């Protein structure tokens, strides 16, 4: 039973939802910003902040957990090198969500999620 579990379902089965969030997280870390729907941006925020927190931790175990989640291994190493300098003084709040115009085809609420 799912009593009071607040996981955004995104209208997909669990395996597809996990794959989408992994891909979006990888893209966000690589590019610095991603344009997607508002619901996906809110779900992506949790995953991206978790990866940045792991990178700030900097341990071997944290690096291995990040490699298991992010698709690009080189990107993980870059993230771990830069995270402490970039986010060392922050305790969370590594991303920003900005709402944009609705998507033309289906009028879905769109948003830009970017790294601060």
Curated annotation (Swiss-Prot):
The keyword Ribosomal protein applies. Keywords: Ribonucleoprotein, Ribosomal protein. InterPro entries: Ribosomal_bL17, Ribosomal_bL17_sf. One of its GO terms (biological process) is translation. GO terms for cellular component: cytosolic large ribosomal subunit. GO terms for molecular function: structural constituent of ribosome. Transmembrane segments: none annotated. It comes from the Bacteria. Part of the 50S ribosomal subunit. Contacts protein L32. Belongs to the bacterial ribosomal protein bL17 family. HAMAP family: Ribosomal_bL17. This is Large ribosomal subunit protein bL17. The lineage of its organism: Bacteria, Bacillati, Cyanobacteriota, Cyanophyceae, Synechococcales. The gene is rplQ.
């Amino acid at each position: 039973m799912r009593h009071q579990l607040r996981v955004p379902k995104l209208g997909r089965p669990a395996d597809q939802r996990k794959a989408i969030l992994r891909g979006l997280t990888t893209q966000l870390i690589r590019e610095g910003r991603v344009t997607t729907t508002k619901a996906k941006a809110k779900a992506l925020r949790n995953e991206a902040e978790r990866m940045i927190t792991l990178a700030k931790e900097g341990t071997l175990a944290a690096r291995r957990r990040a490699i298991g989640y992010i698709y690009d291994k080189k990107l993980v190493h870059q993230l771990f090198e830069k995270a402490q300098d970039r986010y060392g003084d922050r305790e969370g709040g590594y991303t920003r969500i900005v709402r944009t115009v609705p998507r033309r085809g289906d009028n879905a609420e769109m948003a830009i999620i970017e790294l601060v």
